[in-house]
Amino acid sequence: MAAPEPARAAPPPPPPPPPPLGADRVVKAVPFPPTHRLTSEEVFDMDGIPRVDVLKNHLVKEGRVDEEIALRIINEGAAILRREKTMIEVEAPITVCGDIHGQFFDLMKLFEVGGSPANTRYLFLGDYVDRGYFSIECVLYLWVLKILYPSTLFLLRGNHECRHLTEYFTFKQECKIKYSERVYEACMEAFDSLPLAALLNQQFLCVHGGLSPEIHTLDDIRRLDRFKEPPAFGPMCDLLWSDPSEDFGNEKSQEHFSHNTVRGCSYFYNYPAVCEFLQNNNLLSIIRAHEAQDAGYRMYRKSQTTGFPSLITIFSAPNYLDVYNNKAAVLKYENNVMNIRQFNCSPHPYWLPNFMDVFTWSLPFVGEKVTEMLVNVLSICSDDELMTEGEDQFDVGSAAARKEIIRNKIRAIGKMARVFSVLREESESVLTLKGLTPTGMLPSGVLAGGRQTLQSATVEAIEAEKAIRGFSPPHRICSFEEAKGLDRINERMPPRKDAVQQDGFNSLNTAHTTENHGTGNHSAQ
């Protein structure tokens, strides 16, 4: 009789499948950004037409496209823009939009409020990039829409569509982190092709900033050479940078134009200057962007001849910089009726200030522990041990000097430990303050002074570093006017690296003696 076979051990169970991408995230409801970059076959159909919905859904998930696809989109859009006139002419019905500033998820909300670009005519007044952290997504999406709807979606240039500001603020850094410097340079070439103004329905002049003392007629705009980096002064600069005077409609001065002290360049224009321009060019009003508005828009004093607001400002970036708490708005003009549609901000993914990575962000935590260990190691030796060791090898004077040197080293490391401790304990305040400065740098001496210095960073120190004026991290910004006042320093034209900064102000006499500056008959009309 055969012996019974021993029971065989059951095979080990197969290893569990790896968790899905992003399953280990702290906030499970937030999906992990796709790692796959869209290819040409995914973005363009067989006829080379962009699949805008595919691109939109991918960008909303924080996805990216192949670099060559990004370059193709930017260059094809730029080719269309180059064929347009410096002052384009558009007809109603149309939806006019103000600043976007890299707030891509709010741009998606804008199209929900304003209507699908497939059946709605749009005019954007510039400032698509900088300050927000999704600027390249805004450019790619708007440029694809321009390729799809070249005769119904129009894009003007803002003061931020230039090399000078995008290098100083965030757009260049964003392009290099998400794509490459090639993509950034392609964007700059495309920005040089953007028209400067639009004539809406033969009734409204639409522009990013406003008027210039060197522009008297619409033909003066048509003659401008726009295919270049905007200069620090002159009519092209003024179209992008000028503002209505702070007492617009209630001026005490008779001067139509005065130096723009807020921007550090260009001019303030007043109510009589606007009325004179409107009358000379048979227009109803000027529609512009360039300034944040609490309600998303502002209607200025009415013209005495037409009874219509002489000037309208529209701003389409809600909760600007995540601190303004403002509404955004778009202007819909149809059948000689103007409607304002407001909307609030939408949730968006979080980026550390200035695109900081997690390793840089965690450095204060690591640094505090390392310096703490160094302080403890150096603090082991007592004063008696230092003096005893010194007596064996040196005279009393040398021992005292050596003791002082070691004490200085301990104090230096202790100071470094305090800096890292402040960085760790006040990390949120530090990141907030750095994120609100265009250079990403803290005022000198803030960290070394400890927590109290950080919490009471002075107006003078912050101004010296071009940070938000008077910002104190523990202080919560409570109103739109407060946020706008604190951010005022960032509204100025930044200093130029390659030349002495022009004050931007030419006297009117100088302006009139250089009438040909910034103009040329060889530009697109």
Swiss-Prot record:
Residues 357-379 are annotated as: Calcineurin B binding. This is Serine/threonine-protein phosphatase 2B catalytic subunit beta isoform. Zn(2+) binds at D127, N159, H208, H290. Forms a complex composed of a calmodulin-dependent catalytic subunit (also known as calcineurin A) and a regulatory Ca(2+)-binding subunit (also known as calcineurin B). There are three catalytic subunits, each encoded by a separate gene (PPP3CA, PPP3CB, and PPP3CC) and two regulatory subunits which are also encoded by separate genes (PPP3R1 and PPP3R2). In response to an increase in Ca(2+) intracellular levels, forms a complex composed of PPP3CB/calcineurin A, calcineurin B and calmodulin. Interacts (via calcineurin B binding domain) with regulatory subunit PPP3R1/calcineurin B. The modification N-acetylalanine is found at A2. It is an enzyme of class 3 (hydrolase). Its EC number is 3.1.3.16. One of its GO terms (molecular function) is calcium ion binding. Disulfide bonds: none annotated. Residues 65-356 are annotated as: Catalytic. SUPFAM superfamilies: Metallo-dependent phosphatases. Its cofactor is Fe(3+); Zn(2+). Residues 417-424 are annotated as: Autoinhibitory segment. Keywords: Acetylation, Calmodulin-binding, Cytoplasm, Hydrolase, Iron, Metal-binding, Phosphoprotein, Protein phosphatase, Zinc. InterPro entries: Calcineurin-like_PHP_ApaH (IPR004843), Metallo-depent_PP-like (IPR029052), MPP_PP2B (IPR041751), PP2B (IPR043360), Ser/Thr-sp_prot-phosphatase (IPR006186). The gene is Ppp3cb. Activated by Ca(2+)-bound calmodulin following an increase in intracellular Ca(2+). At low Ca(2+) concentrations, the catalytic subunit (also known as calcineurin A) is inactive and is bound to the regulatory subunit (also known as calcineurin B) in which only two high-affinity binding sites are occupied by Ca(2+). It catalyses: O-phospho-L-seryl-[protein] + H2O = L-seryl-[protein] + phosphate; O-phospho-L-threonyl-[protein] + H2O = L-threonyl-[protein] + phosphate. GO terms for cellular component: calcineurin complex; cytosol; glutamatergic synapse; plasma membrane; protein serine/threonine phosphatase complex; T-tubule; Z disc. One of its GO terms (biological process) is negative regulation of calcium ion import across plasma membrane.
